[in-house]
């Protein structure tokens, strides 16, 4: 007797989540303009027309990816600041952010999101998200505006350090070694 297999169908929401994860990786490598929706669909094992049933446009897909990315950063900061005194929150959030940057897709997607800001709709979403993040860090840390500004400045520098993979040349280049000492970059108050 032949054995039958039961194939479970993914819901549209499960499929959307799967596609977003694939698209984050694709956009991280090739950017908004350089990423093909055909390549995303192929990796997801679906047709391009089905992709466009789930996401009406490439921009809508990119923004869905950005929303997931944005929530990961917010959750990283919320978790890091939970249960610690406000004066320690920036240090904890900074360390958690450094760990988050170990994820190549997240690190590169963030840079690609900034690069995609030539599109006014994307720019508006990224700008609003950044403002929300600044407010969250200010609230969680209770830090003065100039300290929060320094925290975000250091975060942007960490993005560049990670994107350039300065750790790979730190043994040969003293300047790179110094810049790869991120704990010293996190504001203490």
Which residues does each predicted region cover?
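Helix-turn-helix
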Residues: 15-18, 22, 26-60
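Amphipathic alpha-helical segments within well-ordered protein domains
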Residues: 74, 78, 94-95, 111-114, ...
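Alpha-helical DNA-contacting segments of helix-turn-helix folds
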Residues: 62-69
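Solvent-exposed, amphipathic alpha-helical segments
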Residues: 22, 26-29, 76-79, 109-113
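Amphipathic alpha-helical segments used for helix-helix packing
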Residues: 98-120, 130
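Hydrophobic alpha-helical connector segments
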Residues: 64, 75-104
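Hydrophobic/aromatic-rich alpha-helical bundle segments in the mid-to-C-terminal region
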Residues: 120-189
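Short, intrinsically disordered or compositionally biased N-terminal tails of bacterial proteins
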Residues: 1-6
